Amino acid sequence: MTKKVLLFMLGCFMMIDTASSQSKELIVEEGGTGRYKSIMKEEASLPAHTVFVPQDLSAFNATNPLPVLVWGNGACTDSPWEHFKFLNEIASHGFIVLATGYIPMVEEPYKGPMSTTQQQIESIDWAMAQNADSTSPYYQKIDTKNICVAGMSCGGLQTLFNCADPRITLLMICNSGLFNQQNAGQAVGGMPMPPKEKLKEIHTPVMYMLGGETDIAYGNGMDDFRRIQHVPACVINYPVGHGGTYRQPHGGEFTIPALAWLQWQLKGDKEAGKMFTGKTPGLLKRKDWTLEKNAKFDKLQ
């Protein structure tokens, strides 16, 4: 083999290696409808996760940091392929979203092993580390005092499994709820299965967002809500079934209350809070939504 051929082959291998090591990224739906156009991307320092974040970080600093949404996927899928429009839209309103699983460059079902509960903890660990790292582009730009952990279906079970983590300041349980002894046999194998007693470990406000009576998680979620009396809790329902509206443009109708919940509780936006408060909450002015609160909910600021 000649020297020229060897050099050519070496160059090809180097090109392949460089391409494979480049982080993937994609602008989804023109960056969302929010003030801060967002991007979906991989971060080499956070493997097996997808990050949604404003494209331009110059507006964020220690006095105006990005609150955090940590997300777990339906079916414990190791990719947010069903939820990326919803998550991207939230990021465009000034949040950093850390989703469990591999980046979905196309809207197709992910085929691979299930995700784990630990991946949500890895997301929180990463946010903390990046905010403290002076060499990181996220240095002093992440609001580590305002972290919501959330998830859909199996991702909601992962969220409840992790609910005791003291770094969490808010929860959002979507199309999900803990199984009881009577219906545990309906669960898909591999799902985390905390007992109902786990609800006592919740130490933050929590919102359940369900798809109405046709949602297979409706009974579990409503039962959870009725058991939670020690922290502010609400449950909202929209009659769309278990799949929600996440795959619709910008996440569809579910984005409206989810974003308001995050803006109110993580950013202190009182106007957003009117979605859930007052004589006639804003959510009830929207077609087909219902809202129930526990006794502690109206004490929320």
Regions found by a protein language model. Give the residues of each.
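Short glycine-enriched nucleophile-adjacent loop
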Residues: 156-166
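The feature captures the conserved acid-bearing segment of alpha/beta-hydrolase catalytic domains
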Residues: 169-248
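Short beta-strand element of the alpha/beta-hydrolase
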Residues: 63-74
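Gly/Ser-rich "nucleophile elbow"/oxyanion-hole loop immediately N-terminal to the catalytic nucleophile
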Residues: 57-65, 109-157
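N-terminal cap/lid segment of alpha/beta-hydrolase-fold proteins
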Residues: 22-64
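Bacterial N-terminal signal peptides
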Residues: 7-15
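Alpha/beta-hydrolase-fold serine-hydrolase catalytic core, especially in secreted/extracellular enzymes
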Residues: 231, 240-243, 248-301
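Short amphipathic alpha-helix adjacent to the substrate-entry channel of hydrolases
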Residues: 80-100
